[in-house]
Regions:
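Active-site-adjacent structural elements in enzyme catalytic cores
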Residues: 59-358
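Short, small-residue-biased leader/transition segments that mark boundaries at the very start
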Residues: 1-5
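N-terminal alpha-helical targeting/anchoring segments
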Residues: 6-14
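Short amphipathic alpha-helices in soluble, non-transmembrane regions
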Residues: 22-30
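Accessory nucleic-acid engagement/destabilization modules that flank
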Residues: 8, 20-23
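Terminal, basic amphipathic appendages of nucleotide-handling enzymes
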Residues: 32, 57-60
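Helix N-cap motif at beta-to-alpha junctions
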Residues: 14-20
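Conserved short beta-strand edge segments in small beta-sheet-based binding/regulatory domains
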Residues: 32-53
Length: 358
């Protein structure tokens, strides 16, 4: 019995000394999925006898407070995303307690919906029921939303939005166009990584003649087709952080030469936002590539664009179409880049999925 305060996490537990110690050991050895336990401090406290379990509303605090990084879309949400019977079918912003934006949408602490950009989107009745029910996977999931009440994608300068915008974007990619896509922490510039002329044009427009471009591959099977890698790299590719991982290219791969010219390696990541998954797989009849160049949407020396205004003023000249959405990004977050040495991973650029973890 007891209660839980959502500060960092404060648990008031009552029971036999053995039971309380077992709880502590369980937290240390089997922490909740995707959680990071920095330290457990325990002390005896004078409390009246508990007769129930409660989760107490968050309190504002001064001092150092842990902030969660953004978390790649989880397998359960992926399943719902492509389940025609699910009310979040093809919803570009599906999330739950195990995944979704965190740092990038946060205005202030503690992390509650009213202090995030999801405050712009009042929950519908169905989402509110899930949000307030401890038995659901979306209990207290701050960005929870659905097709009825959530953010919406659209093409800047066009009336196309929602499904029409996604289909138009996919068609543009397959026609050899360059697009800008707003993701979790900012915009990417994107094109078909198998289309030599499209990749060369992107390089010319961005004035990036030789530096390798990152690619996003549809799934781990596509990654295996294009690159050689071992268990350590696969864990990085498929983990909840979804960084860019530097991998050895296969000579038999289908990525065009201009992706990483005269370079034996290429930076690869897998889709980490629901919108990325929908770019690769959507119920619209478009035959889509499984390989996309996905490079930071910025001008040289500037941070990644995070708003429509940024995109229009800085990268509109680099692309033919801008796919955006109306969930505001407060904190920019570029893709983390990782490599391995002697079988151990190390970070080259620390950002999305890892920041602000110490």
């Amino acid at each position: 019995l007891g209660d839980v305060y959502k500060r960092q996490v404060e648990i008031h537990a009552q029971g036999s000394e053995k039971a309380v110690e077992e709880l502590k050991k369980a937290l240390e050895s089997r922490p909740p999925e995707r959680s990071v336990i920095m330290e457990i401090i325990s002390a005896h406290a004078d409390e009246p006898p508990f007769d129930s379990f409660e989760i107490i509303e968050s309190e504002k605090e001064k001092g150092d407070i842990f902030v969660s990084p953004d978390i790649a879309v989880c397998e359960k949400c992926k399943g719902e995303l492509f389940d025609k019977t699910n009310r979040r079918y093809l919803h570009p912003f599906i999330n739950c307690t195990q995944c979704g934006p965190r740092l990038t949408i946060m205005d202030s602490m503690p992390y509650d919906r009213v202090r995030t950009t999801m405050a712009d989107f009042p929950m519908c009745k169905d989402c509110e029921e899930e949000y307030t029910d401890p038995a659901t996977r979306r209990y207290d999931a701050q960005p929870v939303c659905c097709n009825k009440c959530g953010p919406e994608v659209y093409i800047i300068g066009s009336e196309k939005k929602g499904a029409e915008a996604i289909t138009a974007t996919r068609e543009a990619v397959m026609a050899g166009k360059i697009i800008a896509v707003k993701g979790i922490g900012g915009f990417h510039l994107c094109c078909d990584a198998k289309n030599e002329s499209a990749v060369k044009r992107l390089r010319e427009l961005k004035n990036r003649p030789a530096k390798p471009l990152a690619v996003m591959l549809k799934d781990i099977s596509a990654a295996r087709r294009e690159c050689d890698f071992g268990e350590v790299q696969e864990k990085l590719l498929t983990g909840w952080q979804k960084p860019i991982v530097l991998l050895d290219k296969k000579t038999s791969g289908s990525l065009c030469e201009s992706v990483a010219p005269d370079n034996p390696t290429v930076g690869v990541m897998l889709p980490y936002a629901p919108l990325h998954l929908l770019l690769f797989d959507y119920d619209d009849g478009v035959e889509m590539t499984d390989s996309l160049v996905m490079t930071s949407g910025n001008v040289r020396g500037a941070p990644i664009c995070r708003s429509d205004e940024d995109a229009l003023s800085e990268i509109a000249g680099f692309c033919d179409l801008i796919l955006s959405h109306n969930r505001r990004i407060l904190i920019r977050s570029d893709d983390t880049v990782m490599d391995t040495f002697e079988g151990k991973p190390y970070i080259i650029r620390r950002s999305r999925g890892y920041a602000p973890l110490p």
